């Protein structure tokens, strides 16, 4: 990749697409195979239903469909893109990278491509990394994809995890935006001491303490909840302070969609009403790295997110990891316009 020095460019999201699979799995569907009921699931998590990928639909497939949704809105969205980041913990394979497979299918052969694994923090991490590549003069524009097929790596008979997760994908292009718009600051971090609280056993056997080998995601829900409430508030506050902002300046908090109780606790920490955040986990569950772009796309399509608004992005995930970012939303690109008839809520078809 080659690009001119861009250290003073204002950078932000210049294109955005989303995809969710067609299959809807409701809380009631879990009642027949585990000790639970639909009302209990919703009261504990805020989730009513989620989407599951088809049998032969994988992360790269969904990432491609999110990019296709972007191109449907703006056929020129991939112009000058010379790097691809795919944030995922459910890659098609350990190698080749899912990012490379997506690039092959959307006409970006030759672009740098790599996967990023910070679980639910991944998409916002990816925005920060993409900005760094551009500011370093290494890339001109960067495609950031957050995509997951969590239904395939979660034990569907385990009440502690099966009820939480869904599948989906979002895709954004990071590039130059007009001065005064775009990303302001990011705060990123991780603490491996909490690695045993949220993990994928088959790739976690070398972590301190060790884990039994297996095929499914494991989670200590109580510990993750306490961690999330703390780091979302801390990192969000730090990002605002770095940007010279306060919570009074924030139009929308865009949180990772893990659990409505976590979001409520974070908003209380910020001293902001729930009307200042956007929630869609009731319909999609926790899609890990896809949650933030899915929320952004929904907020654009229904007209809540508008040009010039101040956003605070917050997420946490495996690692344990956390990230927060501030940005002044730029709505000037074709794919960033409202689309109330958007197909992604019912599954964009590639």
Curated annotation (Swiss-Prot):
It comes from the Bacteria. One of its GO terms (biological process) is fatty acid biosynthetic process. Keywords: Acyltransferase, Cytoplasm, Fatty acid biosynthesis, Fatty acid metabolism, Lipid biosynthesis, Lipid metabolism, Multifunctional enzyme, Transferase. Its EC number is 2.3.1.180. It is an enzyme of class 2 (transferase). Residues 257-261 are annotated as: ACP-binding. Its main location: cytoplasm. The active site is at residues 120, 256, 286. GO terms for molecular function: 3-oxoacyl-[acyl-carrier-protein] synthase activity; beta-ketoacyl-acyl-carrier-protein synthase III activity. One of its GO terms (cellular component) is cytoplasm. Pathway: Lipid metabolism; fatty acid biosynthesis. It is found in: Cytoplasm. It catalyses: malonyl-[ACP] + acetyl-CoA + H(+) = 3-oxobutanoyl-[ACP] + CO2 + CoA. The last Arg residue of the ACP-binding site is essential for the weak association between ACP/AcpP and FabH. Belongs to the thiolase-like superfamily. FabH family. PANTHER family: 3-OXOACYL-[ACYL-CARRIER-PROTEIN] SYNTHASE 3, BETA-KETOACYL-[ACYL-CARRIER-PROTEIN] SYNTHASE III. Catalyzes the condensation reaction of fatty acid synthesis by the addition to an acyl acceptor of two carbons from malonyl-ACP. Catalyzes the first condensation reaction which initiates fatty acid synthesis and may therefore play a role in governing the total rate of fatty acid production. Possesses both acetoacetyl-ACP synthase and acetyl transacylase activities. Its substrate specificity determines the biosynthesis of branched-chain and/or straight-chain of fatty acids. Homodimer. This is Beta-ketoacyl-[acyl-carrier-protein] synthase III. It comes from Deinococcus deserti (strain DSM 17065 / CIP 109153 / LMG 22923 / VCD115).
């Amino acid at each position: 990749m080659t690009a001119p020095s861009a250290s003073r460019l204002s950078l932000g999201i210049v294109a955005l697409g989303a995809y969710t699979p067609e299959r809807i799995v409701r809380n009631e569907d879990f009642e027949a195979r585990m000790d639970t009921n639909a009302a209990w699931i919703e009261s504990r998590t805020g989730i009513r239903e989620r989407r599951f990928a088809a049998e032969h639909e994988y992360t790269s497939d969904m990432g491609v469909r999110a990019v296709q949704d972007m191109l449907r809105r703006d056929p020129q969205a991939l112009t000058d893109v010379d790097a691809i980041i795919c944030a995922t913990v459910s890659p098609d394979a350990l190698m080749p990278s899912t990012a490379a497979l997506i690039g092959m299918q959307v006409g970006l052969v030759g672009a740098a491509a790599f996967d990023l694994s910070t679980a639910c923090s991944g998409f916002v991490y990816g925005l920060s990394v993409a900005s760094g590549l551009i500011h370093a003069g290494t890339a001109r524009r960067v495609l950031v994809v957050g995509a997951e097929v969590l239904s395939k790596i979660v034990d569907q008979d385990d009440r502690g995890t099966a009820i939480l997760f869904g599948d989906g994908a979002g895709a954004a292009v990071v590039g130059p935006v007009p001065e005064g718009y775009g990303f302001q600051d990011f705060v990123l971090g991780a603490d491996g001491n909490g690695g045993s609280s949220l993990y994928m056993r088959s790739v976690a056997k070398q972590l301190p303490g060790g884990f039994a080998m297996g095929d499914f995601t494991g989670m200590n829900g109580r510990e993750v909840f306490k961690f999330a409430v703390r780091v979302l508030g801390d990192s969000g506050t730090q990002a605002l302070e770095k940007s010279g902002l306060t919570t009074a300046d924030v139009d929308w908090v865009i949180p990772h969609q893990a659990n409505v109780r976590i979001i409520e606790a974070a908003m209380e920490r910020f001293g902001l009403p729930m009307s200042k955040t956007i929630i869609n986990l009731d319909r999609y569950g926790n899609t890990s790295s896809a949650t933030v772009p899915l929320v952004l796309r929904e907020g654009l399509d229904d007209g809540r997110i508008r040009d010039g608004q101040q956003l605070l992005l917050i997420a946490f995930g495996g690692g344990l990891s956390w990230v927060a970012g501030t940005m002044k939303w730029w709505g000037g690109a074709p794919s960033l316009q409202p689309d109330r008839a958007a197909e992604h809520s019912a599954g964009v078809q590639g």
